[in-house]
């Protein structure tokens, strides 16, 4: 009897997952996330140098982050730009160096272009959530400015805190000798989950449940980590881009990776937004079924 109940529960669970995946598939087709990911990839490449320039300027304004700029750059390029990270880092640093020598008008233009990227992300995610109420211009600008100014500071502070914790004498003990390498190895995954969770909780102009956002963040972070490894393997083992483009191979490689990254981000957002819709549908379906039985 107990085994029959367990089998029935497992069957209901898998049936529920299947229904959710069907609902998610319809959502993905309707929202055309491949087209949105292409748009965001284009805007990202256009805004990449201005965003990095503004970020580094914000970090240089705080003396405590002066010594960790190199660590932040290395961490980002190694963990978020597979295979072509070193080459991209050289070019972007050169572009940022040129951009930082500009006038006040030029720097203001960089900030505007960086805000364009954040605005595009905001609009794309709110479209996924079917948000009807738009933020006012003042509120939207305040949020974008907060992301540009506080975002780099929070990233720098988290890396400083991590470096401090890892350097504590407590972790020099043999008991914790294996903990530090394991923690450092999992750090990119933890940062990815935290970033996706924050994105899915804060950007939509409506209330998002923590567990729904956490599910989307976990799926997106896992796909992001797997995507990094798979993409790096493809680029290194099947160097077709280098054979075709030669010295310019970094450009299409970067564009393809940015496009895939946005596909993953939007997929996580779709999962988060689809959860309450699916649960409401299941709840109403159960009520209708119960009413027909009575």
Curated annotation (Swiss-Prot):
Source organism: Shewanella sp. (strain W3-18-1)
One Pfam family named in its UniProt record: Virul_fac_BrkB
Cell inner membrane recorded as keyword: yes
Localization, UniProt: Cell inner membrane
The keyword Aminoacyl-tRNA synthetase is assigned to this record: no
Name of this protein: UPF0761 membrane protein Sputw3181_0272
Cellular component, GO, one term: plasma membrane
Keywords: Cell inner membrane, Cell membrane, Membrane, Transmembrane, Transmembrane helix
Membrane-crossing segments per the record: 45-65, 102-122, 137-157, 179-199, 213-233, 247-267
Family (UniProt): Belongs to the UPF0761 family.
Topology within the bilayer: Multi-pass membrane protein
